[in-house]
Amino acid sequence: MGSKRIIPSRHRSLSTYEVMFTALFAILMVLCAGLIAVSWLTIKGSEKDAALGKSHEARGTMKITSGVTYNPNLQDKLSVDFKVLAFDIQQMIGEIFQSSNLKNEYKNSRVLQFENGSVIVIFDLLFAQWVSDENIKEELIQGIEANKSSQLVAFHIDVNSIDITESLENYSTTSPSTTSDKLTTSSPPATPGNVSIECLPGSRPCADALKCIAVDLFCDGELNCPDGSDEDSKICATACDGKFLLTESSGSFDAAQYPKLSEASVVCQWIIRVNQGLSIELNFSYFNTYSMDVLNIYEGVGSSKILRASLWLMNPGTIRIFSNQVTVTFLIESDENDYIGFNATYTAFNSTELNNDEKINCNFEDGFCFWIQDLNDDNEWERIQGTTFPPFTGPNFDHTFGNASGFYISTPTGPGGRQERVGLLSLPLEPTLEPVCLSFWYYMYGENVYKLSINISNDQNIEKIIFQKEGNYGENWNYGQVTLNETVEFKVAFNAFKNQFLSDIALDDISLTYGICNVSLYPEPTLVPTSPPELPTDCGGPFELWEPNTTFTSMNFPNNYPNQAFCVWNLNAQKGKNIQLHFEEFDLENIADVVEIRDGEEDDSLLLAVYTGPGPVEDVFSTTNRMTVLFITNDALTKGGFKANFTTGYHLGIPEPCKEDNFQCENGECVLLVNLCDGFSHCKDGSDEAHCVRFLNGTANNSGLVQFRIQSIWHTACAENWTTQTSDDVCQLLGLGTGNSSMPFFSSGGGPFVKLNTAPNGSLILTASEQCFEDSLILLQCNHKSCGKKQVAQEVSPKIVGGNDSREGAWPWVVALYYNGQLLCGASLVSRDWLVSAAHCVYGRNLEPSKWKAILGLHMTSNLTSPQIVTRLIDEIVINPHYNRRRKDSDIAMMHLEFKVNYTDYIQPICLPEENQVFPPGRICSIAGWGKVIYQGSPADILQEADVPLLSNEKCQQQMPEYNITENMMCAGYEEGGIDSCQGDSGGPLMCLENNRWLLAGVTSFGYQCALPNRPGVYARVPKFTEWIQSFLH
């Protein structure tokens, strides 16, 4: 039976599930189409919004003036320094805008770069829609001024430096146009398609116009522009020969013809760069320049380059620089046409291939050979041909040829103004397997020649002296030699120590030979006896002098006294008598050498006078039957000295006492007692009206019971009829501010008393009384006069970790003291006409006060014409009578201004502390001054400020064991060092903030160098001298 296959039909109805799936698929297709359409519309809308300016990116710049210091790492966007600071800036910007009226529009920010000039920040801002530049700038400034970011505690932004412009992303740049040696910035209108960055003064734009860098960074051998345009040879090609970067192993550059001066001066600069590890040798085929036109040769490039030679007039011979990079600059300031300039060639060489004798041997005919000037000394050796000036010191010819054609080296010629070390260093020398002989010729001629020393040192900082000569050896070249046997790498150093005036030292023909030094064929030189034998500096004594043995002199009088002398004479009189000291002749080196006269025995005596310089000087009178005279000289010049005598008697120099019914004025004259404190000056010096009211039994210098002096008797004020106006009037008489409070005080006895009433003209009427109504006295408290308040708003800043530039007006009581035109010390303004400073500043400089000048309101010593500045001469100097220069105790002095000053925002007095007020250890106080910023460095231009913690005297004594830290001193500083006052800060304030007023806690006195660990600064403790200071103010 056959079978039959059944084929299903092609058309059938869909199942329920199939219908559902089909419907869902169709819906999904519609949704996708819709989403695509919405996305397309959104994109087109965004493009339209962008076209209409609804999405916005702006670029901004601002300057951070404190809280962060610029360093080269901020140029590297991958550095930790860049990332940390950029994060903080972006956080600050975000916090400000998120709390501003633009919080809905603001999206984010991005720091692009940092530039030098404090720290300049360039950043981008992104907003969801278009915002005007003015609106962005206004919100940013308001946020900074309102401290809307926690980051503003860490650093300060100069709001005047903030600038906002359209982002440069959609704009083209205009490159700076150039001339031969000068860049100028073009500034087309800021319209879409064309914008150029505007640079701050002293900066120029890079070629991409995206970045500004300092003018000095152009053509300095280091890339500072991202596009490298700051070192572009087209820009940097010199006006002298059209060259700039020299990179071959040898080459040349020249200023064969001076370029015509288009400005006040022209600078031609070349960069020489050879392979790493090589050094560079320079030679001059000719060299004939004007004295004003200087060729400087530096080791290295960029900001780290080191000046190795300054050349003018004469061919310097060969110069070798031990670096693979050299910067050469030729500064042309003359318009002379008679000078042909110079032609220089350079060659690379490998100094490591030199042997020891090649490194040492030198007759200076061809420059300094391979010797190097010591950069850590005080001056430089000079290469000399022929005679030096002045006469009577230094050679007339070299040693090599024995005539004026040869060369030698000498310490700086001329009179000189100080003692200085002049050093010459060899390259590192290889250890020797056998001894070698170092030989040389030296010339030490002149009345004041000091010392020539030769040292060797190794990399372990072990140094030893192998040769030394001192004194004047006459007009001869002298031979010197020393055997060396060093087993490790070492250097040789020639050190000449030069005094003032006739003290030149010269060298020639240095050589190194193998084997020990032979016995010298030349006789050992002997010193020239050009001066008498040195006098002993110890006078003997102290000498006890009594009548009739009353005449005494400085040592060796009438001939010059010795240097470094210290002499003491004790003058004696019978009990009840006093002493008059008279100088018949007097001539000392000014300031440096002094006669100090004290009232009584030295240990606890009071200072009577300090005399120095040429005479005549005034007689001095003791108040006791003993007087101490000290004579102290330094190690420089000497003079003829002095001859003195003394007499004894009763009341010598003291005015005759007044009658019982008279008052004796401070100038000695007498006035009737009834005229005392009557409101009218009867004494010519006004002393009869000087001390007529005081506080009694007060807990502070501005409160207590009130007493008035009627004739010679003090009367306590009654509370009867006392008014608020009375309080104000009495407080004013006391030299204080307005009355703060007054209250009755019950007391029985203690008379006599005085009742106060106010006259119709407002003056006080005093009526003596034996009793007060209800035994009620007045207890008065006065406000202090306005003091210790900063008038110029100061930004909040973090704790200073080192001396920092202060803001103008930050310390309006800090005064700069100039002596003979030189900034010498600091001081503090305590009233309209009195300054507090250090006694050691004025010691020996007190006889002619008008040589001192006080500059108030000063911020920068380089700008003495600022409108905030007021200058006053000093007309009186008072050293605290307890000051002891040798013990450095009571180091405080008062200086009176010739004319009173008016208080301004930049000139204000500082407050005085209460007498014996305690400033506890650990308290953070402030110091300020223009002194040296590092030990043996240069003084500061801008007023420096720093915070320092106070130390106990016990701890200070442990850290300063060589000094006696007395109760009149206080100390401040960090154990780790790094913050301290230094030379030039003396006399300036140590200031502590209390109740929103700055108090003068200390006066900068002394220290051991500056800012060393466990070496605090020492200050005169002002609370110990408050009463003494106030005696000048009222």
UniProtKB/Swiss-Prot annotation:
Keywords: Disulfide bond, Glycoprotein, Hydrolase, Membrane, Protease, Repeat, Serine protease, Signal-anchor, Transmembrane, Transmembrane helix, Zymogen. The chains are derived from a single precursor that is cleaved by a trypsin-like protease. Residues 48-1034 are extracellular. GO terms for biological process: proteolysis. Glycans are attached at residues 116, 147, 170, 194, 283, 343, 350, 403, 455, 485, 518, 549, 645, 697, 701, 721, 740, 761, 804, 863, 902, 964. Residues 240-349, 539-649 form the CUB domain. The keyword Mitochondrion does not apply. GO terms for cellular component: membrane. GO terms for molecular function: serine-type endopeptidase activity. The chain crosses the membrane at residues 19-47. Residues 54-169 form the SEA domain. Gene3D superfamilies: 2.60.120.200, Low-density Lipoprotein Receptor, SEA domain, Spermadhesin, CUB domain, SRCR-like domain, Trypsin-like serine proteases. Residues 693-786 form the SRCR domain. Disulfide bonds join C199-C212, C206-C225, C219-C236, C240-C268, C539-C567, C658-C670, C665-C683, C677-C692, C772-C782, C787-C911, C825-C841, C925-C992, C956-C971, C982-C1010. InterPro entries: ConA-like_dom_sf (IPR013320), CUB_dom (IPR000859), LDL_receptor-like_sf (IPR036055), LDLR_class-A_CS (IPR023415), LDrepeatLR_classA_rpt (IPR002172), MAM_dom (IPR000998), Pept_S1A_enterop (IPR011163), Peptidase_S1_PA (IPR009003). SMART domains: CUB, LDLa, MAM, SEA, SR, Tryp_SPc. Residues 1-51 form a propeptide. Residues 800-1034 form the Peptidase S1 domain. It is a single-pass type II membrane protein. Belongs to the peptidase S1 family. Responsible for initiating activation of pancreatic proteolytic proenzymes (trypsin, chymotrypsin and carboxypeptidase A). It catalyzes the conversion of trypsinogen to trypsin which in turn activates other proenzymes including chymotrypsinogen, procarboxypeptidases, and proelastases. Heterotrimer of a catalytic (light) chain, a multidomain (heavy) chain, and a mini chain. This is Enteropeptidase.
